[in-house]
């Protein structure tokens, strides 16, 4: 009996020892509810910001994240910026396998050190160190930490515990430490807890946010901006020093004033020669808007965009006189230069900070901070006709913004302070793609004919990338766009009307042998070969987010087929009319003599809709897919 008892005790002791020795980053230890919808799990993340004084801040991060599959790989990419005012200390890390067993180590020597070249970034003088673990066996875990020492106290990174959809969080914390006389403002967005503020005996203040067991938010098609439902804390100082420049702000007016006075003013001087040239060039134009258009096109014709590493932390534009001499600049420099040219003929304009993104991300009206916005555009406040310009493109029309910067709050930096303005919205009716096609089909099934398509509103730039390609590459791309069987392009032209209501026109002449199938005296072909919706949104059960349509559009197609003599339409003409709160679809066909005439209209209406309408949206798209797949059967007359 004693021996049996001893064995049992040994087994229990052994099991306890194995459990105690289990590696802390073993994937098996992740709570099961954190695996649902997850591609990555943040096991532990500690972010601390220690403001020593106005001119010295220490930023420290330590993170352990488990990558469950390749969709989570970006969470293992480590990117750390640095420049002459930001130094990196003690950067290191470890990679573990699924059992939490170390497989490799890395240090600063393993990082690639590169210059940033993002064409729309405001941080273009910043270098980055980048590291990506070479791991192909999933799951794996990466642990890393580093410290940045920053000369200044203007910009603090947001805390985003679940940085994106598909990421769950076991534990995450954000600690902000500062002296008694250093005051901050903060904004909590979708945070289930609130800040804990403590003060030690020396008056040192500590703000702490903590989260644990945060489930992943699954990706859902047609979802709103992630900032509407992911967790974020934003922090901004009241007083600060930025690379030797002191300042303070508690609202957008004060921040815009500081930016104008310290980063923009006194950088708009031009030579007398340039000023006289601009005055002479616009001398015969009385309308201020047309005068500004002339100047904008002059700027486009003599400059080109480059990523320039210059200025105070990437925020200060080149001198206008330098751009005038060198004929290049970044987004800041080209806006500043255009402002200077306009100023020469007494046209007022505003230097505006915007968040450039296909999603409409506005600067927060109730919370000002320097790290909102990544691009600069120009505003011309004409009376009852405010006009906006993006100065980084040498091809887009005067007054055109497009979907990258339309319909959002921006900060105008003026001598009188900052103003929150809103860029214009391109309405659904403006965003039109209208196509007219005239085709012939012969008895052998060959299709010949031509199409003309006009693009307006946000669609104006739909062919922008193609226009500047070589003729052979243009043809190749158009064959991908128009998936017509055996299509040969005999002629292809693009024209751009760059008036105040710009239009891109595409003209194409095609020939497609054996486009239609011929069998036993009948001809079969796809009614709509030029503009079909081919896929439906994924079915989502228990949807969590509202349905969001970012941009409203209208597509109109008019196709006329001349049918071969001696044939008639065998199948019944197709008519579809589908209408929902978020969209419409109308398709009709009719016979007029030897003409088969097909008309199609597809409309999406931008806006936010209840999550309960998502299945209606899926059904709507499925109905459109079915309608767009309609086949025509022509039969020979008896």
Where are the model-predicted features located?
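Bacterial Sec-dependent N-terminal signal peptides
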Residues: 1-24
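A sensor for short, sequence-defined functional sites
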Residues: 21-638
